[in-house]
Amino acid sequence: MDFCFSYTSILAGDETYVRVKAAGSTFYRAIDSVAATIDFFPSVFRSADAAKALLAKALADPSHPQPRVINTDKAKCYPAALHESKEEGVLRRRCRHRPVQYLNNILEQDHRSIKKRIRAKQHFRQFGCARRTIQGYEVIHRIRKGQVRWVKKGDVLAQNQFINRVFGLAA
């Protein structure tokens, strides 16, 4: 998204469980040290491949700097994903991994607004529908957090005008 600001060199990654048709899905999210959302990745399974895909997707944009530190919780999928990403050259070899739960508190709090909307919707019936809907939630959440270059954080009128302009809606 070319409307966003640049990011800092500390990245936090976490996953959240979303119920889809009585089964579960996992949505991986990455934020920087100032709680700006970098990217998210939906996955049917919680695995190292999904965590690696999030990392590759988050670092694919040249406007995102290579992180010096990646904070994650103690999930077993992250060390393998980070090791493979370093081997493939997606991630610098000097990047540190800090698997400490409390360092992800900002990200856990950031999940709250998305999870609140999911609970209000009473969960999803199909994975594709969940992916598209949560993608919309994430974009609106970015706009509300002030991550869009031309829209201030508390300016609701400007946020509405921006959404109307981007989606071509009548005002």
Predicted feature descriptions by range:
Residues 1-171:
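Residue-level recognition of single "structural anchor" positions
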